[in-house]
Protein backbone atom coordinates (compact mmCIF):
# COMPACT_ATOMS: atom_id res chain seq x y z
CA UNK A 1 0.00 0.00 0.00
CA UNK A 2 1.01 3.56 -0.60
CA UNK A 3 0.74 6.51 1.76
CA UNK A 4 -2.29 6.75 4.05
CA UNK A 5 -4.57 9.78 3.74
CA UNK A 6 -5.12 9.78 7.47
CA UNK A 7 -4.63 7.60 10.48
CA UNK A 8 -6.87 6.43 13.30
CA UNK A 9 -5.79 4.74 16.46
CA UNK A 10 -7.15 4.35 19.94
CA UNK A 11 -5.68 3.05 23.13
CA UNK A 12 -7.50 2.26 26.34
CA UNK A 13 -6.29 4.09 29.40
CA UNK A 14 -4.48 1.70 31.71
CA UNK A 15 -6.73 0.09 34.32
CA UNK A 16 -9.89 1.62 32.85
CA UNK A 17 -12.54 -0.46 31.14
CA UNK A 18 -14.72 2.20 29.54
CA UNK A 19 -12.56 5.29 29.07
CA UNK A 20 -11.16 5.19 25.53
CA UNK A 21 -9.19 7.89 23.73
CA UNK A 22 -9.38 8.19 19.93
CA UNK A 23 -6.75 10.10 17.99
CA UNK A 24 -7.01 11.34 14.41
CA UNK A 25 -3.55 12.28 13.11
CA UNK A 26 -2.48 13.04 16.65
CA UNK A 27 -5.63 14.99 17.62
CA UNK A 28 -7.88 13.58 20.32
CA UNK A 29 -11.49 12.89 19.26
CA UNK A 30 -14.15 12.64 21.96
CA UNK A 31 -16.36 10.05 20.27
CA UNK A 32 -16.91 6.32 20.09
CA UNK A 33 -14.00 4.97 17.98
CA UNK A 34 -16.07 2.64 15.80
CA UNK A 35 -18.85 5.16 15.25
CA UNK A 36 -16.35 7.82 14.23
CA UNK A 37 -14.52 5.46 11.87
CA UNK A 38 -17.85 4.57 10.27
CA UNK A 39 -18.63 8.27 9.75
CA UNK A 40 -15.36 9.17 8.05
CA UNK A 41 -15.16 6.23 5.62
CA UNK A 42 -16.79 6.65 2.22
CA UNK A 43 -19.61 4.19 1.51
CA UNK A 44 -21.14 2.79 -1.64
CA UNK A 45 -18.07 2.93 -3.89
CA UNK A 46 -18.72 1.02 -7.12
CA UNK A 47 -15.52 -0.55 -8.36
CA UNK A 48 -14.27 -3.63 -10.19
CA UNK A 49 -11.23 -3.68 -7.92
CA UNK A 50 -11.00 -6.11 -4.99
CA UNK A 51 -10.32 -3.10 -2.74
CA UNK A 52 -11.66 0.37 -3.53
CA UNK A 53 -9.98 2.35 -0.77
CA UNK A 54 -10.95 3.03 2.80
CA UNK A 55 -9.90 1.78 6.21
CA UNK A 56 -7.34 -0.94 6.82
CA UNK A 57 -6.29 -1.92 10.29
CA UNK A 58 -7.25 -3.92 13.34
CA UNK A 59 -9.23 -3.76 16.57
CA UNK A 60 -7.84 -5.83 19.42
CA UNK A 61 -9.68 -7.87 22.02
CA UNK A 62 -9.23 -5.18 24.68
CA UNK A 63 -11.59 -2.88 22.77
CA UNK A 64 -14.46 -4.77 24.38
CA UNK A 65 -13.63 -2.83 27.54
CA UNK A 66 -15.27 0.22 25.95
CA UNK A 67 -18.63 -1.52 25.74
CA UNK A 68 -18.71 -4.22 28.41
CA UNK A 69 -17.71 -4.26 32.06
CA UNK A 70 -14.95 -6.87 32.03
CA UNK A 71 -13.32 -5.82 35.26
CA UNK A 72 -9.83 -4.45 35.67
CA UNK A 73 -7.73 -4.44 32.50
CA UNK A 74 -4.10 -5.50 33.03
CA UNK A 75 -1.45 -2.83 32.69
CA UNK A 76 -0.24 -2.25 29.12
CA UNK A 77 3.47 -3.09 29.16
CA UNK A 78 4.26 -2.95 25.43
CA UNK A 79 2.38 0.13 24.22
CA UNK A 80 0.69 -1.41 21.17
CA UNK A 81 -2.57 0.39 20.26
CA UNK A 82 -5.76 -1.54 20.95
CA UNK A 83 -7.17 -0.19 17.67
CA UNK A 84 -5.31 1.18 14.66
CA UNK A 85 -6.54 2.09 11.18
CA UNK A 86 -5.15 3.84 8.12
CA UNK A 87 -7.44 5.46 5.53
CA UNK A 88 -6.18 4.94 1.98
CA UNK A 89 -6.98 6.37 -1.42
CA UNK A 90 -3.54 5.75 -2.97
CA UNK A 91 -2.30 2.17 -2.92
CA UNK A 92 -0.96 -0.83 -4.81
CA UNK A 93 -2.80 -4.11 -5.25
CA UNK A 94 -0.60 -7.20 -5.57
CA UNK A 95 -2.27 -10.14 -7.33
CA UNK A 96 0.06 -13.01 -6.44
CA UNK A 97 -1.93 -15.52 -8.46
CA UNK A 98 -1.78 -13.56 -11.72
CA UNK A 99 1.57 -11.98 -10.79
CA UNK A 100 0.29 -8.48 -11.51
CA UNK A 101 0.46 -5.16 -9.70
CA UNK A 102 -2.38 -2.62 -9.93
CA UNK A 103 -1.70 1.05 -9.20
CA UNK A 104 -4.67 2.92 -7.73
CA UNK A 105 -4.96 6.68 -7.24
CA UNK A 106 -8.27 8.20 -6.17
CA UNK A 107 -9.63 11.44 -4.70
CA UNK A 108 -12.51 10.20 -2.57
CA UNK A 109 -10.93 11.61 0.60
CA UNK A 110 -8.54 14.35 -0.53
CA UNK A 111 -10.81 15.88 -3.20
CA UNK A 112 -7.87 16.31 -5.59
CA UNK A 113 -8.72 17.32 -9.16
CA UNK A 114 -8.26 14.85 -12.01
CA UNK A 115 -5.00 16.42 -13.18
CA UNK A 116 -3.47 15.96 -9.74
CA UNK A 117 -4.65 12.36 -9.61
CA UNK A 118 -3.20 11.58 -13.05
CA UNK A 119 0.09 13.24 -12.11
CA UNK A 120 0.33 11.22 -8.90
CA UNK A 121 -0.53 8.03 -10.79
CA UNK A 122 2.18 8.70 -13.36
CA UNK A 123 4.75 9.35 -10.63
CA UNK A 124 3.99 6.02 -8.95
CA UNK A 125 4.28 4.15 -12.26
CA UNK A 126 7.61 5.88 -12.94
CA UNK A 127 8.90 4.91 -9.52
CA UNK A 128 7.89 1.29 -10.06
CA UNK A 129 9.61 1.15 -13.43
CA UNK A 130 12.84 2.66 -12.10
CA UNK A 131 15.47 0.06 -11.33
CA UNK A 132 16.31 0.15 -7.64
CA UNK A 133 19.11 -1.55 -5.70
CA UNK A 134 18.16 -4.82 -4.09
CA UNK A 135 17.66 -3.69 -0.51
CA UNK A 136 15.47 -6.59 0.56
CA UNK A 137 17.74 -9.62 0.26
CA UNK A 138 16.44 -11.93 3.00
CA UNK A 139 19.01 -12.81 5.64
CA UNK A 140 19.37 -16.20 7.25
CA UNK A 141 17.14 -16.30 10.30
CA UNK A 142 18.23 -17.81 13.59
CA UNK A 143 15.95 -19.82 15.84
CA UNK A 144 14.22 -17.59 18.40
CA UNK A 145 14.21 -18.35 22.11
CA UNK A 146 10.77 -17.46 23.44
CA UNK A 147 9.79 -16.71 27.01
CA UNK A 148 6.23 -16.44 28.32
CA UNK A 149 4.90 -13.77 30.65
CA UNK A 150 2.54 -16.15 32.50
CA UNK A 151 3.79 -19.24 34.32
CA UNK A 152 2.27 -22.54 33.19
CA UNK A 153 0.67 -23.19 36.58
CA UNK A 154 -1.03 -19.78 36.55
CA UNK A 155 -2.34 -20.32 33.02
CA UNK A 156 -3.67 -23.80 33.86
CA UNK A 157 -5.45 -22.29 36.86
CA UNK A 158 -7.09 -19.78 34.49
CA UNK A 159 -8.24 -22.70 32.31
CA UNK A 160 -9.70 -24.52 35.30
CA UNK A 161 -11.61 -21.40 36.42
CA UNK A 162 -12.97 -20.89 32.90
CA UNK A 163 -14.20 -24.49 32.74
CA UNK A 164 -15.91 -24.09 36.11
CA UNK A 165 -17.72 -20.92 34.99
CA UNK A 166 -18.85 -22.64 31.79
CA UNK A 167 -20.19 -25.66 33.69
CA UNK A 168 -22.08 -23.35 36.05
CA UNK A 169 -23.63 -21.46 33.14
CA UNK A 170 -22.00 -18.15 34.00
CA UNK A 171 -19.92 -18.06 30.83
CA UNK A 172 -20.45 -19.50 27.37
CA UNK A 173 -17.31 -18.32 25.61
CA UNK A 174 -13.81 -17.50 26.77
CA UNK A 175 -10.56 -16.62 25.01
CA UNK A 176 -7.53 -17.28 27.19
CA UNK A 177 -4.21 -16.08 25.88
CA UNK A 178 -0.70 -15.22 26.86
CA UNK A 179 2.18 -13.38 25.27
CA UNK A 180 5.47 -14.94 24.21
CA UNK A 181 8.51 -12.70 23.72
CA UNK A 182 11.88 -13.16 22.04
CA UNK A 183 14.82 -10.96 21.14
CA UNK A 184 15.01 -10.42 17.37
CA UNK A 185 17.71 -8.36 15.67
CA UNK A 186 16.77 -9.04 12.04
CA UNK A 187 14.33 -7.30 9.73
CA UNK A 188 10.66 -7.99 10.53
CA UNK A 189 9.87 -8.20 6.80
CA UNK A 190 12.45 -10.99 6.41
CA UNK A 191 10.77 -12.89 9.25
CA UNK A 192 7.39 -12.44 7.56
CA UNK A 193 8.73 -13.63 4.20
CA UNK A 194 10.28 -16.70 5.76
CA UNK A 195 7.04 -17.51 7.59
CA UNK A 196 5.03 -17.05 4.40
CA UNK A 197 7.24 -19.59 2.58
CA UNK A 198 7.73 -22.20 5.30
CA UNK A 199 4.17 -22.18 6.66
CA UNK A 200 1.82 -20.32 4.28
CA UNK A 201 -1.66 -19.31 5.34
CA UNK A 202 -4.59 -17.55 3.71
CA UNK A 203 -4.80 -15.34 6.78
CA UNK A 204 -1.32 -13.81 6.77
CA UNK A 205 -0.59 -10.08 6.90
CA UNK A 206 2.41 -7.85 7.60
CA UNK A 207 1.18 -4.64 9.19
CA UNK A 208 3.59 -1.73 9.58
CA UNK A 209 1.94 0.82 11.87
CA UNK A 210 4.03 3.07 14.03
CA UNK A 211 7.75 3.45 14.67
CA UNK A 212 9.36 0.23 15.92
CA UNK A 213 6.01 -1.58 15.77
CA UNK A 214 5.40 -4.28 13.16
CA UNK A 215 2.54 -6.75 13.44
CA UNK A 216 2.29 -10.14 11.73
CA UNK A 217 -1.22 -11.60 11.76
CA UNK A 218 -1.26 -15.35 11.26
Describe the function of each predicted region:
Residues 1-218:
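Extended alpha-helical targeting/anchoring segments
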Amino acid sequence: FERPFSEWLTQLTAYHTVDGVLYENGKAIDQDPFEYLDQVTVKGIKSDLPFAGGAIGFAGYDMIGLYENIGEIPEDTIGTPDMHFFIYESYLIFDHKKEKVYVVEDNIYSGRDNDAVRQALGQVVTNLQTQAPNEFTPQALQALQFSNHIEKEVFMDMVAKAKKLIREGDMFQCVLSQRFSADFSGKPLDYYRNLRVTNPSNYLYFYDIIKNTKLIFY
